[in-house]
Amino acid sequence: MGSIRGDLQPLFVMPPPPLDEDCDDIFNSDESSWGLLSLSCFGIIMGLWFFASVCLIFGVYGSETVWLGPNSSILVKPSSIFVKSINAKELDFSKPGLQLYGFNGQSTPSGYFVNWTESRVLSVSQNSYKGWPYYLNRGTHMNISYNILPKGSAVRLVITEGMPFFYRSSLKDIAFRDTAWSWNLIQGSGMIQLDISKSKGYYLTVANLKRKDVEVELDIDVKVVLYDTKQSSYNCSFSNGECSFKMNERSPVENYAVVTSPALGQGVSIDDEWYIELSYQPRLIAYGSFTGVLLSFMLVAIHFCNKLKCCGGEGFLSEDDSVRTCLLADKGDNDCCNDVEASNKSLCAICFDAPRDCCFLPCGHCVSCYQCGTKIKRTKGRCPICRKKIMHVKRIYTA
């Protein structure tokens, strides 16, 4: 019987102890994953802020060109938080009369109505068109009376939003109804009424797509909205072709500028046009301050999340590492290891050979023998349970 028992192999073989590098990888993998996640979030948020800054500087507060006719008034009201000054430049510096008014720390300039009438007689050749710009504020009302000669002829009266050079490239573009703000096929005599709901530049075009010349008579009665500039704190007459209005940073909301063109008469005709470019000088200190605040907030958030991770300990370990975590847990967290023999609880969680006869200071965790604990302090220097820095490895002597 003795010889038979000696030939029997044990039913359970203890797995070889993990290497020191494997034990460190268990706890360092989640730390590196958390670091990558933090860097990814940081990069995404800073990238979004950079994209928003570019959109503000070159999009919302980018330069724009505006055509003005007589009796026009443009209200410009950017935020002085992001804009340092408003610049207006006359691109076709040939006609005087433009004025720029500035309002600092005041309410929005009030609007008032001005009525004026213009008459135009247009000879429109076959497959051609004629047009002119307006800048109309919200609330403006227009009555356009027309008479087309010879009788039976028809033309298209089109009003488009935006700058006129978008519509001078092709005559067919004007004929399509979906590209215009107002599209009308007119013949004989009649009247068109229009109410402006958006302050914007408009371009009125009379297009003749037929193969014969026509004559178009237009009587345009306009009840236009202009802005009162009597209470302005700044005035510039474009004497050198451009004006600049500096925003008041102490009043970040109530800052406005108004650009006006002269009324009809006194050397101003209905054919006069002014072409200006509006641009904004960015307040770079505001963008820098917002970037600094966002950067500080992100660093503080990452710092607190790292603190919470340290307090959470091994809560970030994956399911595959749960068995190894149980071997390294404190006495109070050994519920998941009830199926392990009681004798294994007192063995070193690193080598599974020597008893646990040391503790780490200052955290006080006891998970390894003195030899393995000394090696951990020398190689990594952090407790494998709480990841706190190990100051001393204290040996425990038992009776």
Swiss-Prot record:
Keywords: Membrane, Metal-binding, Transferase, Transmembrane, Transmembrane helix, Ubl conjugation pathway, Vacuole, Zinc, Zinc-finger. It is found in: Endomembrane system; Vacuole membrane. SMART domains: RING. It comes from the Eukaryota. The chain crosses the membrane at residues 42-62, 284-304. One of its GO terms (molecular function) is zinc ion binding. It is an enzyme of class 2 (transferase). This is E3 ubiquitin-protein ligase APD4. It comes from Arabidopsis thaliana.
